[in-house]
């Protein structure tokens, strides 16, 4: 799986990573605020906007009214009731996003949510970490035959395997996202090597869905080969909400887009470890050649007493060959401080 296309966006290992700003529930249920955040992301250079599609009664049982997330003071049920957009408002948000030329992406947290997004005509699905091992829901969404970006936080390789099998069986193009689901995530729990483990285990494109408070983890992920980066997004860090603390604002988003492009260039595309041809101008003066360090008479044996290695590297014998010519006899008189050539000895 070398490439995924979502409308006009191409994701592969050669291009700069796709940066996904997630508005999520940062709009607190306000369509107008959601539009303001879309505008802010657009102004920063975003190509895509991610939302969360919550249909609470299909997503959660009443037991969720007793579960309070670690980054909140009210139950997850109450949070989602407050923040969910209904069909009309979400469709309006999707249309607004697309009028700006941006791709609308969302995470469904239920079968009804997935059906809503399919009915709206989305081009791809984002799967949250909590749904990574929700195999019935994964199968349901896979039936739509759309590309999927799948977060894998809180899951092990073993629990991810059934999801990947579903995707492969349905021939779904996908990216696996390493994630740590702590809001915010301390740097010592980012564990970027886990992203490499996903790539090794599943031979797929990978990315990072990050919940730290800066862009550092994302940039590190790019250096390691991330094709997709995701962070929560807000137009202002002064907003209220459980995800604001780990969100990026317009300035941070603009920086992440620009710096991730630069990091991808610095990473390169699987080049082997060898000198770049452009380095020749430096090689010429930085490398060393074999030179005489005193006058040498014809017939004299070359030794460490009369030859050594010195810059520049423009001589006939490189420093790497020094030991191979020790013990050879000079075929001519050689003046001190002369760069040797193979014609000088036998």
Swiss-Prot record:
Domain named AFP-like: residues: 289-346
Disulfide bonds: none
EC code: 2.5.1.56
Taxonomic superkingdom: Bacteria
PROSITE patterns linked to this entry: AFP_LIKE
Catalysed reactions, as listed in the record: N-acetyl-D-mannosamine + phosphoenolpyruvate + H2O = N-acetylneuraminate + phosphate
Pathway field: Capsule biogenesis; capsule polysaccharide biosynthesis
Signal peptide boundaries: none
Gene label: HS6.11
Keywords: Capsule biogenesis/degradation, Transferase
Job description of the protein: Transferase involved in the biosynthesis of capsular polysaccharides. Catalyzes the condensation of N-acetyl-D-mannosamine (ManNAc) and phosphoenolpyruvate to generate N-acetylneuraminate (Neu5Ac).
Record keyword DNA-binding present: no
The UniProt record lists the keyword Transferase: yes
Protein name, per record: N-acetylneuraminate synthase
Enzyme superclass (EC): transferase
